[in-house]
């Protein structure tokens, strides 16, 4: 029986203001039906993720990046109608990060994922 797996390549850095940097994992391997959690970590630690909104983008091979969602808080977030609710985000303030969750992962989710941070919503 063949095993079909998905790989996620995570790229950064979109923000570099006053030596502030976003860091992401290089790669994540998951199987269809599993949960993928992709972290976007803000550093240095004196700059807190609490103060920023995070936008997430997906780029499939051979395609332009596609806006997935924006998350600042439970009260301030946005996901376009054409993006499935399998994609969600939340902040992990203990690790100064925003986490994109894909649940359950589907074969078409095989892509590169990018994050960017800012003070307001801007797809």
UniProtKB/Swiss-Prot annotation:
Disulfide linkage: 40-115
Signal peptide: 1-20
Tissue specificity remark: Expressed in B-cell precursors. Expressed in fetal liver, bone marrow, spleen and lymph node.
InterPro entries in UniProt: Ig-like_dom, Ig-like_dom_sf, Ig-like_fold, Ig_sub, Ig_V-set, IgV_Light_Chain
Keywords per UniProt: Disulfide bond, Immunoglobulin domain, Signal
Domain Ig-like: 21-123
Gene Ontology cellular-component annotations: endoplasmic reticulum; extracellular region; immunoglobulin complex
Single biological process term from Gene Ontology: immune response
SMART domains: IG, IGv
Gene3D superfamilies, sorted: Immunoglobulins
Purpose of the protein: Associates with the Ig-mu chain to form a molecular complex that is expressed on the surface of pre-B-cells.
Recorded family membership: Belongs to the immunoglobulin superfamily.
Protein name: Pre-B lymphocyte protein 3
Organism (species): Homo sapiens
